[in-house]
Design a protein with these regions (language model features):
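Substrate-binding clefts and catalytic carboxylate motifs of secreted carbohydrate-active enzymes
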Residues: 49-139, 154-155
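Acidic/polar loop patches that form or flank catalytic/metal-binding clefts of enzymes
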Residues: 125-129, 171-177
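Active-site-proximal helices and loops of the catalytic beta/alpha 8
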Residues: 1-66, 71, 117, 134-165, ...
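Short, solvent-exposed loop/turn segments at secondary-structure junctions
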Residues: 1-3, 77-81, 133-135, 186, ...
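Carbohydrate-binding surface patches
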Residues: 181-219
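Residue-level detector of short, conserved catalytic/binding motifs and their immediate flanks
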Residues: 116, 124-125, 145, 198-200
Length: 228
């Protein structure tokens, strides 16, 4: 859904939405600096943690708790450029750049960061066919290319499987509470938790190693606890 969905989600109509405002857009801006159609690049949005959490919290509050918990959280779909193509920070479409350019200078490490967020953020993670295999493409219709049979990125497929297993294994990622914990330039930290389990997710979108002290007590982790 494009725009504020409050009126549709206030009762008697929709249960939830395809979650652009409280997932796809904030994640894309933060990790790539790109607009979701690859129509604009904004350096001021790349790694902007304040904008990320601000957009997420505002739009999640407009949706409400239950719609957020079952929202369709996608990185790509049939209406927008493939997330992997957005990682090249190139503005363009099939008519202006051509098909090959959609695969130039892409960064699969950024896609993996996005998948971690997709599998740990509140909502229902929804993988658009081929994203798990490393498919690229500009916005519609280039985003609807055939599945790359025989050319799949098997390492990326296995990464998706691992993250899906984690999502399924730990209930806190499916129905637990959420809290932002800390953030800085090009990094964010948030928690998912319930009465039995607490999980801390740290996303570092820098080029270098990051060492930070985190107030994880905010989600109920004791001072001398040992994290796996």
């Amino acid at each position: 859904h494009y725009g504020d969905s409050y009126d549709w989600l206030s009762g008697g109509e929709w249960d939830t939405v395809m979650n652009y405002d409280a997932f796809m857009e904030p994640v894309t801006w933060f990790l790539t600096g790109m607009e979701k159609h690859s129509d604009q690049y904004r350096e001021d949005m790349l790694g902007n943690a304040d904008n990320f959490f601000g957009a997420m919290h505002h739009n999640m509050s407009r949706m409400g708790g239950q719609p957020v918990s079952i929202s369709m959280n996608e990185l790509s779909n049939h209406d927008h450029s493939r997330f992997l193509t957005r990682t090249n920070s190139t503005v363009g479409r099939i008519a202006t750049k051509g098909a090959k350019a959609a695969n130039e200078n892409v960064e699969k490490c950024i896609l993996r960061e996005a998948v971690v967020m997709q599998m740990t953020w509140p909502g229902a993670p929804t993988v658009y066919y081929g994203d798990e295999a490393g498919m690229v493409g500009w916005t519609d219709p280039d985003n609807r290319r055939s599945y790359p049979w025989g050319k799949q990125d098997w390492e990326l497929i296995e990464f998706h499987k691992d993250m899906i297993r984690i999502h399924k294994k730990y209930e806190c990622f499916r129905s637990g509470s959420y809290k932002s914990i800390a953030s800085g330039s090009h990094w964010i930290c948030y928690g998912r938790f319930n009465k039995k389990l607490q999980a801390v997710i740290l996303i570092n979108n820098r080029r270098e190693t990051l060492t930070v002290d985190l107030p994880i007590w905010q989600i109920g982790i004791l001072e001398n606890a040992c994290l796996k």
